[in-house]
Amino acid sequence: MTRNKVNRRDFIKLSAVGLAVAAGTRAISEARASEAVKGEHQWAMVIDQSKCTGCGYCTLACQAHNDINPDIEWNKVSNTGEVNGKMVYLARPCMQCEHAPCVEVCPVGASYYRDDGIVMMDYDKCIGCRYCEIACPYQARSFNWEAFDGANPAVPEWGTPEVERRPRGVPEKCAFCYQRIDRGLALGMKVGVDIEATPACCVACPTGARLFGDLNDPESNVSQLLRKHTSYRLRENLGASPRVYYLPVDEAVTEEG
């Protein structure tokens, strides 16, 4: 009897996972009507791979300002190979997709859109089902199996916490340092220009590889970069429309060193 019950429970869990994946795929392709009405600002990030050195400062600043467990990374940096003898790196925050499968599969509405395009998490509402984590095509979410009760090794060297720690048993993710954006706008600052109103990862980058701004503003730094340079987004064929753009490695730059 016990064995049959365990098998049935496992079957139900596996079925739920399958449904989450299927729903995520459907959400991307159909772009359903639950998307937020677009507001005055539409935030985006541009990452220049020609400038990224893989130093990891962005990850450390993110962990400090968002008070993240050192075993979890909201911003991941990986080595993707070489171009003309120069190492190429790929930095991956949450992509803040316009058609986010994580939002579509959440059964309790804990994942949701802000009108400025940021995909948010209501950690108090989250039930820890992990459907969003499974549905995300970018592996942007990390499930915290244990409560983070200790000291944060990234504090104070890389910044001080600006948000509360998440409860145990929820999938955590980057939210473009929304707290800095909101505070900056309230104080009349220019997001993406004024340091206090810009995501911590962008501020910490020593080479200026990460830029942030408003796609609705044609004069913003991101709008100008995207007009002047060739860019790409990860897995564009899925139709999720991520808000993180990459400037590919310029071979002329790598030849110059």
How should these model regions be labeled?
Residues 78, 175, 245-247:
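Residues in well-ordered beta-strands of folded domains
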Residues 1-19:
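N-terminal secretory signal peptides and thylakoid transit peptides that target proteins
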Residues 15, 19-26, 66, 140, ...:
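A generic secondary-structure signal for well-formed alpha-helical elements
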Residues 45-66, 86-110, 120-139, 164-204, ...:
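Cysteine-centered iron-sulfur cluster-binding motifs in ferredoxin-type domains/subunits
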Residues 5, 25-56, 233-240, 245-246, ...:
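C-terminal segment of N-terminal export signals and the immediately downstream linker at the start
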Residues 28-37, 64-92, 112-125, 139-170, ...:
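Non-heme iron-sulfur electron-transfer modules
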Residues 179-257:
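Long, compositionally biased charged/polar accessory segments in the mid-to-C-terminal portions
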